[in-house]
């Protein structure tokens, strides 16, 4: 069989995928797909219902079914599909199943318990797991690193303060500071006994914080933690109440209605427990709307329930819009109308009247970004903003001009000192803070990364303002310095080196670099070298642990599409590898869509991974449509930034 798809085959695949994606669009123009993580968020939701004595037995039963389905052959729970045993996820899942009412003597519980003990016991779980255990009364509070609420009073110039953290850390830590200060016991109708998963009785453990440490800073911060614990009697008095009020005000100002604090589950749950701790008898009026926000994260299907970490409507809509605008040339007259509806929906969600947390570091920047979720006005991100801006610009309707310009100005204002961009904040790069005991996940910060930087360069280059060239050049210099020896780039928000390399090659092409530039050539050669025998590409989440590319055991439609888009961006539209990839996508398409078992993104490398359920739908459509358009073009060059 000819490896190249015929024009008819390609058109049929595009039509089927476009029809499928069109049917998933909501009446108001937006798309939103499931965003799935591992066992930890559903387990934490179980704890929350028990903590608040608001248990839904049927929902909990279905969460139990979900947890059992994703239990690994090793007896525990992984962080991603077919992943290795993860201690913290396994402790949470086991505890959740026990809270739901599963018999500890059941074979699957025995396997989980033994696996936990074989990996050091629950006492070796990470900090956020131990926080949950402390809230449940399963361990003493000394098992959690000390974080005095007086941190709220520390100024921005101090070596540690809440503004030095990433947005996700800030929105979680602030209510947690109040919880730690008040140390509530919750409303558990009955204590959940978990001593059987500890190798040492919790009350006898003294070395809750121990190495290996990432650097010498780890030893320093452990000593500081010990000193803070000794000082707790004093800290319980000095400036405590005013710090609690300041933390509560911070949360109140960012409560965000039915979208929740930070629009992420952990921050919502901690804010709920914070208010409960502050008003344990009568409750707090804000608690009702927080419960509403959490309920909107619940997914129920096929007898199972899980809780999403957040929702992704802006991201899903702008990416679907790019796929559809690329597919419009296939001849379906309804596609353009769907893109227009998506653009109008996005336009209404630009954040122009709120100076979010980003303004603490960039006070002169003008608001103009988009958030990832439905509403998260204090926390727009430059990644979503750049991708939305490119879609509105490609649409070409003059009514979007002002919004695009505001996005441009905000993104320029958010560039970091080193020329790159972080997602939510500028210069959020005090790396020593990742060594504090509270940050054993190593994800306290939001430093510049290649994928986000690339998106900003793509956007600014697509707009083509001559005055922005110096901004773009600084970004390019950052990307050149961040390239790995094999030619790839790290992917902070998608898996992993394929995602990062796709992002950067699109940007370098948009910025006008010659495709023979060694930076581009090395990256393209790397992508070509890792194509799989079936024509697809597939990278495993283990690449984050290995600090280098790790092949998945199967090709992923989304990653295949990224590789195709990357190669086409730098002049390889006619390369046999691209044609083989198109053949792979065509042959694996079923009723207009693709299956994708594996996780395809990351929340925190080595700690928390994600599966975007929409990636398998819109990215292959995007890539196949791009190939069709380049086949038909005279220049064979990608003219857009994305």
Regions found by a protein language model. Name each.
Residues 1-642:
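Preference for long, amphipathic alpha-helical scaffolds in soluble/luminal domains
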């Amino acid at each position: 069989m000819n490896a190249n798809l015929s024009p008819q085959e390609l058109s049929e695949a595009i039509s089927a995928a476009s029809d499928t994606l069109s049917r998933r669009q909501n009446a108001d123009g937006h798309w939103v797909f499931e965003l799935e993580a591992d066992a930890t968020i559903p387990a934490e939701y179980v704890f929350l219902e028990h903590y608040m004595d608001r248990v839904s037995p049927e929902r909990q039963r279905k969460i139990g079914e979900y947890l059992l389905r994703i239990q690994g052959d090793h007896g525990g729970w992984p962080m991603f599909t077919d992943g290795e045993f993860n201690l913290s996820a396994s402790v949470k899942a086991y505890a959740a199943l026990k809270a739901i009412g599963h018999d500890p003597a059941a074979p699957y519980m025995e396997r989980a318990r033994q696996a936990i003990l074989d990996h050091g016991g629950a006492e070796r779980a990470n900090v956020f797991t131990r926080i949950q255990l402390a809230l449940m009364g399963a361990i003493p509070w000394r098992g959690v690193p000390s974080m005095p609420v007086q941190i709220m009073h520390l100024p921005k110039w101090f070596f540690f303060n809440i503004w030095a953290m990433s947005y996700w850390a800030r929105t979680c830590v602030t209510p947690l500071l109040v919880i730690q200060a008040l140390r509530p016991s919750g409303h558990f109708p009955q204590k959940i006994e978990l001593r059987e998963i500890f190798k040492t009785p919790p009350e006898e453990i003294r070395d809750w914080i121990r190495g290996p440490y990432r650097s010498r800073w780890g030893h320093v911060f452990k000593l500081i933690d010990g000193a803070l614990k000794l000082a707790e009697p004093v800290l319980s008095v000095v400036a405590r109440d005013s710090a609690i009020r300041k933390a509560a005000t911070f949360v109140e100002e960012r409560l965000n209605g039915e979208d929740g604090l930070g629009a992420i589950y952990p921050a919502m749950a901690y804010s709920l427990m914070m208010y409960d701790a502050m008003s344990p008898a009568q409750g707090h009026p804000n608690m009702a709307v927080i419960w509403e926000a959490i309920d909107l994260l619940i997914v129920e299907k096929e007898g199972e329930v899980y809780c999403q970490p957040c929702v992704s409507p802006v991201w899903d809509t702008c990416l679907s819009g790019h796929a559809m605008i690329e597919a419009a040339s296939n001849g379906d007259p309804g596609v353009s109308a769907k893109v227009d509806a998506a653009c109008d929906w996005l336009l209404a969600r630009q954040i122009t009247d709120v100076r979010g947390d980003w303004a603490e570091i960039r006070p002169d920047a003008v608001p103009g970004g988009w958030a990832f979720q439905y509403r998260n006005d204090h926390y727009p991100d430059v990644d979503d903003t750049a991708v939305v801006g490119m879609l509105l610009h490609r649409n070409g309707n003059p009514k979007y001009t002002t919004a695009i310009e505001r996005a441009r100005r905000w993104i320029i204002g958010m560039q970091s000192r080193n020329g790159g961009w972080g997602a939510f904040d500028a210069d959020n790069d005090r790396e020593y803070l990742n060594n504090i005991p509270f940050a054993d996940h190593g994800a306290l910060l939001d430093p510049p990364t290649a994928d986000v930087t690339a998106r900003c360069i793509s956007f600014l280059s697509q707009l083509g303002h001559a005055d922005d060239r110096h901004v773009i050049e600084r970004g390019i210099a950052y990307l050149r310095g961040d390239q790995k020896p094999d030619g790839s780039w790290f992917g902070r928000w998608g898996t992993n080196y394929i995602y990062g390399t796709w992002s950067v090659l699109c940007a370098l092409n948009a910025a006008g670099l010659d495709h023979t530039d060694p930076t581009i050539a090395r990256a393209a050669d790397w992508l070509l070298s890792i194509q799989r025998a079936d024509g697809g590409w597939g990278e495993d989440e283990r690449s984050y642990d290995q600090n280098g590319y790790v092949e998945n055991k199967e090709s992923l439609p989304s990653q295949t599409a990224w590789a195709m888009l990357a190669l086409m961006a730098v002049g390889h539209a006619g390369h046999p590898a691209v044609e083989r990839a198109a053949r792979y996508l065509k042959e694996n398409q079923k009723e207009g869509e693709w299956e994708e078992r594996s996780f395809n993104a990351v929340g925190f490398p080595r700690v928390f991974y994600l599966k975007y359920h929409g990636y398998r739908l819109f990215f292959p459509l995007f890539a196949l449509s791009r190939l069709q358009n380049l086949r038909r073009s005279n220049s064979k060059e990608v003219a857009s930034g994305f």
